[in-house]
């Protein structure tokens, strides 16, 4: 059983292209997702409504791993917080989230930098959430 904090960068909400994919701080490819086992866990922010559907649709695969969505956990664990996005969590956790306004014309390095920083933020957020869940349950 392995745990992977991941993120993707794609060309927008109605994605037609995935620019890059990162898990545990390293760039991954389609084979990474294909080879996941049911006992593996994928952790990400808004993965249930965005990343997983985009991966399954554009890569033509079915993700077999268990899923933990840190956005849903954020709503649950921090109900009085107004904004639950990764940018806001980056501010709270002191990790700057790179801003991207062009989702089609940047270099792979620029998309990868953003993706890796998102994984850093989300890893720190997941560790915080996990510690709170352990205290609660």
Say what each PLM segment does:
Residues 1, 38-40:
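A general structural motif
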Residues 1-21:
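Entry/capping segment at the start of metal-dependent catalytic domains
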Residues 14-16, 23, 27, 40-134:
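Active-site-proximal helix-loop-helix substrate-binding element of RNase H-like nuclease domains
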Residues 29-36:
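Short acidic low-complexity segments
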């Amino acid at each position: 059983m392995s745990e992977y904090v991941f993120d993707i960068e794609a060309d927008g909400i109605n994605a037609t292209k995935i620019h890059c994919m990162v898990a545990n701080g390293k760039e991954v490819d389609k084979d990474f997702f294909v080879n996941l086992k049911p006992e593996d866990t994928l952790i990400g922010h808004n993965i249930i409504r965005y990343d997983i559907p985009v991966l399954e649709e554009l890569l033509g695969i079915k993700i077999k791993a268990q899923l933990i969505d840190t956005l849903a956990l954020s709503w649950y664990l921090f109900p009085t917080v107004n904004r639950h996005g990764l940018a806001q969590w980056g501010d709270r956790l002191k990790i700057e989230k790179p801003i991207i306004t062009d989702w089609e014309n940047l270099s792979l390095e620029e998309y990868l930098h953003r993706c890796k920083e998102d994984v850093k933020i989300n890893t720190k957020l997941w560790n915080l959430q996990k510690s709170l869940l352990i205290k609660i349950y």
